[in-house]
C-alpha cells in the first residue's frame, strides 16, 4: 500500500485554495476590545466573499472554529452562515483543536470535497481574548442550581449561607492544561531548559520575527490578505497588526523579566506570543469547480497530518511529529520544500522543534526513522515573520499561515510550502501546499 496521500476527489481533481483573508490581529483589549469572535468571523467571511465576488448562495459548507467559546453562541459556524447572506440550508458546524483549530476546519472542508459531498466550502477560525466567558466558582455554580430548585425563603437563605466572599468572585477562563495544570508558558520553560535554549537565542528569534514582519508590512505584501476592520461604534478602524515592534532593537528584549519562572526562567513576554484578537478564513473548491467559475487558485493542498504526544513533557513539540508524516504522505523530504511556515507560540518552543528537526537521535528514538527530518534552511523559514510578531488568535492562526505561505509562494513563482503548528493537549499539525 502506498504511503502517498491522495488529496483529490473521485475525478482526480485537487483541492484548490481559491482565496484567503484575515482581519488585522490586535493585542488583547486594544483595537478589538468588545468585539466578539463571532463578529470578527462574520466580518472576515463577508469581506472574503465580497473580494472574491463569490455568490454566498454557492457556499455548500462552512466549518469554523473557536477555542475560547462563548456560551451565548456555541456554534459559531452556524451564526456566521446566518449573518453573511448564505443559504439558510448551508451546512455549518464548529470545530476546536486548540491552536490547530483552523487547520482542522480546512481539512474538514477539504475532505468533504474529496468525498464529493460538496464542491465549495469555507474554513477558518476566530478568537477574542478581549470578550471572554467569565465564569463563577464551583460552589457558586452549585448553589445557583440549588437556588433554582429551592421553594421557600428559608431554603434559599440556607443555600446562601454556604457561600463565602471568595465564592462570589468571577473566574476567568483557564490558561492551564486541564489534565496537568501546566500552562503553555511553563511548558515552554521546560523545553528551554531541557534543550539548553538560551535567553539570547530566544530573544534573537523574536527580534528576527518582528523585523521581518515590519519589513513585510512596509513592502505592501500583506495588503491583499489583511482587510481593513471597522469596529463599533464605527468611529475608528484597524488596518494592520498592532503587536509588531517597529524598528525592533535586539538589546531591548533583554530588559524584560522572565514571565513564568521568575528566578531561573528565560521565557518572557517579548519572546512569547501575546493574547490576541482576530479572525481568518479561506475558500476551498474542487479544482474543476474553481476553473469553471474562472478562479486562479492561490494554492492546492498536497498533504496533511495531525499528531498527538504526551502532555507532561515537551507538549509543544507537535511540529516535529506531524511534519515527517505530512512529508511522507507528499512523497517529499524537508529539503524539497520551497518555504517553511512554523507557528511561533514561543521562541523556546520554535527553537526546540527546529533542534529536533535536525536530530538523528530524536528521529530514531521518537519517530522510528533512520535519519533526521532535516536541518531547517533559515532562508526558507518564516520569511515574512511569524506569530511572535503578528500575534496569535488561537483559532485564526492556521488559515493565516495557509494563506500567507500560498501568497508568498505565488510571488516567488510557485513551489511547495510547509505550514505546521503545535497545539495545547500535546497536539500537532502539518500541511503541505503546492503553488503554480
Curated annotation (Swiss-Prot):
Keywords for the protein's UniProt record, in alphabetical order: Acyltransferase, Cytoplasm, Fatty acid metabolism, Lipid degradation, Lipid metabolism, Transferase
Lineage: superkingdom: Bacteria
Catalytic activity: an acyl-CoA + acetyl-CoA = a 3-oxoacyl-CoA + CoA
UniProt key word Chaperone: no
Pathway named in the protein's UniProt entry: Lipid metabolism; fatty acid beta-oxidation
Annotated EC: 2.3.1.16
Gene Ontology biological process terms, A to Z: fatty acid beta-oxidation
Catalytic site: 99, 392, 422
GO molecular function: acetyl-CoA C-acyltransferase activity
Subcellular location: Cytoplasm
Stated family: Belongs to the thiolase-like superfamily. Thiolase family.
NCBIfam families: AcCoA-C-Actrans, FadI, PRK08963.1
Subunit structure: Heterotetramer of two alpha chains (FadJ) and two beta chains (FadI).
Task performed by this protein: Catalyzes the final step of fatty acid oxidation in which acetyl-CoA is released and the CoA ester of a fatty acid two carbons shorter is formed.
PANTHER family: ACETYL-COA ACYLTRANSFERASE FADA2 (3-KETOACYL-COA THIOLASE) (BETA-KETOTHIOLASE)-RELATED
Protein name, entry field: 3-ketoacyl-CoA thiolase
